[in-house]
């Protein structure tokens, strides 16, 4: 009772210096797409700024290590010197939403300083399987439904992708989708906020 502050995740709470001891975790939310299914495209998507911690470099190295029939798309703020990636620079939300529905796999290779991961939820909600570095924030976000590789480790990522080649991808995506529907749907998060306001 009498919560004085909120945070979107345990990781955000741990990194904050000004929160009171009475802090409730209330995550970000998304509007769940109820008319979506796994997209059986074997392409890869990265979303994030072209800066070290977002680790576009690993995504580029992945593109050099995989069958050339796969398409690699990066929605980012500046182009790197690599012709295997299709770069989409500072596109609109509508353009992003159109692209994200036609990929298959979302790669989240960030190396540090992540407190949540809303783009991961958006990707799953658009019919993609999310494959994430094993940051605490991402493990907290997806729990047992997540597909993880060792932080900044290309060989670990390739091993995970190779294992997925022999897996039931529909089942994996459904587990991720059900997880985000249960934990991050707008009504659930709204109920959490109402609870906090009622306990001020």
Name every feature range the model reports, one short phrase each.
Residues 6, 30, 36-54, 60-64:
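Conserved donor-binding/catalytic core segment of Leloir-type glycosyltransferases
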Residues 11, 29:
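Carbohydrate-associated surface elements
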Residues 97, 120-125, 136-140:
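Short alpha-helical segment that forms part of, or immediately flanks, the ligand-binding pocket
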Residues 74-98, 105:
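Nucleotide-activated donor-binding/catalytic signature segment of Leloir-type glycosyltransferases, i.e.
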Residues 132, 146-155, 161-168:
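Conserved acidic donor-binding segment of nucleotide-sugar-dependent glycosyltransferases
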Residues 111, 128, 132-142, 151-152:
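Short glycine-rich donor-binding/catalytic loop of glycosyltransferases
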Residues 101-115, 128:
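Acidic donor-binding loop of glycosyltransferase active sites
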Residues 34, 53, 167-200:
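A charged, aromatic-enriched C-terminal amphipathic alpha-helix characteristic of glycosyltransferases
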């Amino acid at each position: 009772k009498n919560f004085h502050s909120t945070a979107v995740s345990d990781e955000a709470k741990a990194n904050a210096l000004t929160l009171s001891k009475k802090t409730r975790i209330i995550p970000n939310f998304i509007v769940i797409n109820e008319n979506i299914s796994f997209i059986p495209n074997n392409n890869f998507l990265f979303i994030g700024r072209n800066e070290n911690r977002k680790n576009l470099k690993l995504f580029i190295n992945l593109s050099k290590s995989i069958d050339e029939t796969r398409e690699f798309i990066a929605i980012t703020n500046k182009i790197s010197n690599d012709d295997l990636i299709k770069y989409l620079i500072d596109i609109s939300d509508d353009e992003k939403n159109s692209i994200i529905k036609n990929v298959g796999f979302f790669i989240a290779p960030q190396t540090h300083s992540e407190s949540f991961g809303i783009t991961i939820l958006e990707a799953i909600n658009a019919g993609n399987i999310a494959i994430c570095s094993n940051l605490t924030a991402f493990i907290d976000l997806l729990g047992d439904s997540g597909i993880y590789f060792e932080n900044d480790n290309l060989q670990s990522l390739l091993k995970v992708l190779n294992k997925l080649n022999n897996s039931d991808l529909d089942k994996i995506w459904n587990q991720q989708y059900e997880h985000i529907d249960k934990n991050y749907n707008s009504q659930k998060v709204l109920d959490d906020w109402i609870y906090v306001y009622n306990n001020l």
